[in-house]
Amino acid sequence: MKKSYTILAIIAIIVVAIYVMLPKERFAETVFPLGDGAKVSAYDDNADGGKSAVQFKSADSLVSFQCALGVDEKKSAWCGLVFNFDPNGEKKYHNWKNVDTLYLDIDIAGTNEINVKTWTFDPDVTDLKHPETFRLLLKEVPVKPGRNQIAIPFEQLYIPDFWYNDRGVKRSRNRPHHESVARVEISAGWNQPRGKNFTVNVREISVSGTSNRAYGIFLFIILGLMIVAIGRSHPVKEYDEKK
């Protein structure tokens, strides 16, 4: 019996060594500059009676966005910049299950905070005719004037309470659906002063992560070892009982 466990221990050590040596599969994807089929655009509140003013220009290597929120405090105001992977509604979503970091390389003026958002397709909630029904994941990001190179841990993007309330969705249904990312968005921070211009110039947005395939192989081997260990222990017990 001791010999069996010694052999299993040796095998386990070998498995761990193999796992350490397995090459980690890096996942990387660029949001901007734009990939095939993607589109960048700006939005404001004018269609809903707001007075926010937006200036927007897009080139291959730089997106320039400027906004001043409407000064009427009695009205809600909003503006932002959207990078859309599926502008034609063909469900060409991006699988970011292996993403662990979202990178921003941006120039900032006129604000000390931006909201960074991803919108994901949720088959139980999303109506393709209504973009706001995609699942929202949000991160408030502090910024400074000038160039900002920011790495955001992807797990820090959260589903805000107002999304659940607006959509009438139970909070227990909190799966982020990272496997179907439809859009990335940058918008004004919550405390942006009304009427004050703020500028976001986007040099690059990208994501990266490590595939967990090697970890899955490792667990599968460990499971196999456990089965072998259990199988080898049973004949010994039966032999002891017969004696």
Where are these regions (language model features)?
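Beta-rich carbohydrate-recognition modules and glycan-binding surfaces
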Residues: K2-K243
